[in-house]
């Protein structure tokens, strides 16, 4: 997986105001050794989109992203119940 991150500054600010999470902080979800990556099949009309579920500050963060060349392009992040539930279910399965 690429190790460079990028994002739109205006989307970052909008996400921070709406969900209380900036994209710089969202990068930390990828550092969780037990993170889970899942394809977002519901919103992949033009390009493939993914979710990263990882623990940041003791809570499960969901990061929405796509791959652009050698970069991970973040376009959404937050602490959502559905993301936490999916992360916990996958941890039980993969253990």
Give each language-model segment a name.
Residues 1-95:
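Ribonuclease/tRNase effector modules and their secretory precursors
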């Amino acid at each position: 997986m690429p190790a460079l991150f990028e994002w739109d500054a205006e989307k970052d600010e909008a996400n921070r105001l709406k969900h209380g999470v900036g994209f710089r902080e969202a990068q930390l979800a990828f550092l969780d050794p037990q993170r889970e990556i899942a394809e977002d099949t519901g919103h992949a009309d033009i390009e493939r989109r993914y979710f990263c579920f990882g623990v940041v500050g003791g809570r499960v963060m969901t990061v929405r992203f796509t791959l652009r060349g050698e970069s991970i392009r973040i376009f959404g992040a937050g602490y959502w119940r559905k993301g936490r539930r999916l992360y916990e279910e996958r941890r039980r399965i993969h253990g």
